[in-house]
Amino acid sequence: MIELSATAYAAELQRFKLRGRVWLASKDIPADVQVPTAWRALLDMRDAALETSLAKMWAGVVDRLPAVRQFFDEKLRRPAVLQKENGDLCLLYPYTVDHDDLNFFIGHPPLGDLVSDDMPLWRALPDDLRSFYQLAHNGWTFFPANSMGPLPIGDQTALTAKLDLTPDETRALGVNPDLVWTVFQNGGGDYLCLDLRDSAGDGSAAGRIWWHDNPAELEPVDFWAVMNAWFEIFVEDADRR
């Protein structure tokens, strides 16, 4: 059975060239490292209280993603704060598979006041997704693939950047690919996107899947339901805590 310690976390991250300092308790964090208050609180929380506290931090979006809430309740191990070599901070969400394979989802600091409704893209995102980016994490994905969760804003692109289509194929998509935004990737080259013409507010009906092996078509889907389903399938083999 794998050891769940700061040393073990750091060693696993280093296997993928991610180096830095890891802390599992807030008392170990140096005074000059400015860690979000909610993250500090998580480090000192009993396992039984983790799900409730994370649900508050993820308010809104966690109700859209019941598989994530179940993951927090049943499979998430002790969270930790990582300070990368460049000084950037992340919140580590560890879990194990077969009790000896340590894995992480990584959450980046929330955007807070760095965004405003004056930004057209920001206004176009679903309300609960905006809340997530602003209050919980600017991206929360499986490491190192940067997949299976909402991508950081800076890693999202218009679908145009993924396409190599003829003009006729582009017209057949039925939507300007500049207005289709990649929000979530499944690690296999496929993207869950938002049609920005209809994504503000609830966002459910604005979901589109772009399959890399069928690049000239977009599949209309329920945005939140697909995100939840893809995540649920991905972590189904994770060990129970």
Predicted regions, residues:
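A surface-exposed partner-binding patch
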Residues: 1-190, 199
